[in-house]
């Protein structure tokens, strides 16, 4: 990351953002922080996957993080939550036995799946609002709105899946 920053003269905050992302990924399960075992796994992953990763792409493409990116950040964060909850669902039994303190362990897969649908709905609603209320941006938010319907519809179709059946659950998570 440091060599990339030097070679391509990216913004001063490129390397610190990469470092934060790496530290969050490393300390998700590694001591001494062990974020996933202390109830911080979802928020750290949602931030890393929903804000830092798209932020890095945006930063590399545009040379800076500007208001267009920050307008998108709440929706990206919602999809970061969507991501982490989906990947936790098939592993809830192992997480419980391993001592992780995540939302799936605490509240169960049924409520967790409701949170998956909720987070996807929030992401879509944000993109709908951006499409309606912001027209001055160089970004056409309508495309975000259209593509946000894919995980929402797939998730809603999966509402009838027997979440107790691990094979069906894994199939649904792959679809999500």
What are these regions (language model features)?
Residues 7-22, 26, 91, 136-155:
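Hydrophobic alpha-helical transmembrane segments and immediately flanking/interface helices
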Residues 12-19, 43-44, 69-74, 113-117, ...:
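Hydrophobic alpha-helical transmembrane segments
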Residues 33-41, 62-68, 89-96, 162-171:
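A cytosolic-side transmembrane-helix exit/cap motif
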Residues 1-3, 77-124:
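Solvent-exposed interhelical
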Residues 125-129:
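Transmembrane-helix signature of multi-pass solute transporters
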Residues 1-64:
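Intramembrane alpha-helical segments
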Residues 132-176:
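Extended hydrophobic alpha-helices typical of membrane-associated regions
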Residues 19-32, 51, 56, 74-90, ...:
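Transmembrane alpha-helical segments that form the membrane-embedded catalytic/substrate-channel core
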